[in-house]
Amino acid sequence: MPGGVPWSAYLKMLSSSLLAMCAGAQVVHWYYRPDLTIPEIPPKPGELKTELLGLKERRHEPHVSQQ
């Protein structure tokens, strides 16, 4: 088996890792409570609160270094 580990130990470790990963994801979703609703009308550009406004400003003003 992988790394010289017996099948029983490998499956125990695999299942416990998977269980811990799923439990951790569930706890994070309970804590942060993400909004998983899908709006019927998509928002217009600029209405999203997650837009990176600093990135938008940098695109319009390219910085040229003087050497």
From Swiss-Prot:
Mitochondrial matrix side of membrane: 1-8
Residue ranges that the UniProt entry lists as topological domain Mitochondrial intermembrane: 26-67
Membrane topology: Single-pass type II membrane protein
Signal peptide extent: none
A biological process from GO: mitochondrial cytochrome c oxidase assembly
Transmembrane segments: 9-25
Observed phenotype of the null mutant: Uqcc6 deficiency leads to complete loss of mitochondrial respiratory chain complex III, resulting in growth retardation and a mild increase in blood lactate levels and significantly decreased exercise tolerance. The subunits of mitochondrial respiratory chain complex I, II, IV, and V are not affected.
Cellular component GO terms held in the UniProt record: mitochondrial inner membrane; mitochondrion
Localization (cell): Mitochondrion inner membrane
Expression (tissue specificity): Highly expressed in brown adipose, cardiac and skeletal muscle (at protein level).
Family: Belongs to the UQCC6 family.
Purpose of the protein: Required for the assembly and stability of the mitochondrial ubiquinol-cytochrome c reductase complex (complex III or cytochrome b-c1 complex), a multisubunit transmembrane complex that is part of the mitochondrial electron transport chain (ETC) which drives oxidative phosphorylation. Mediates early complex III biogenesis. Participates in regulating the levels of electron transport chain proteins, and therefore energy supply, in response to changes in energy demand. Also required for cytochrome c oxidase complex (complex IV) assembly.
PANTHER family, per database record: HYPOTHETICAL PROTEIN LOC691921, UBIQUINOL-CYTOCHROME-C REDUCTASE COMPLEX ASSEMBLY FACTOR 6
Oligomeric and partner information: Interacts with UQCRC1. Interacts with UQCRQ. Interacts with UQCC5. Forms a complex, named COMB/coordinator of mitochondrial CYTB biogenesis, composed of UQCC1, UQCC2, UQCC4, UQCC5 and UQCC6; stabilizes nascent cytochrome b/MT-CYB and promotes its membrane insertion. Forms a complex, named COMA, composed of UQCC1, UQCC2 and UQCC4; activates MT-CYB translation. Forms a complex, named COMC, composed of UQCC1, UQCC2; UQCC3 and UQCC4; mediates MT-CYB hemylation and association with the first nuclear-encoded complex III subunit UQCRQ. Interacts with MT-CYB.
Protein name per the record: Ubiquinol-cytochrome c reductase complex assembly factor 6
Organism: Mus musculus (Mouse)
High-level lineage: Eukaryota, Metazoa, Chordata, Craniata, Vertebrata
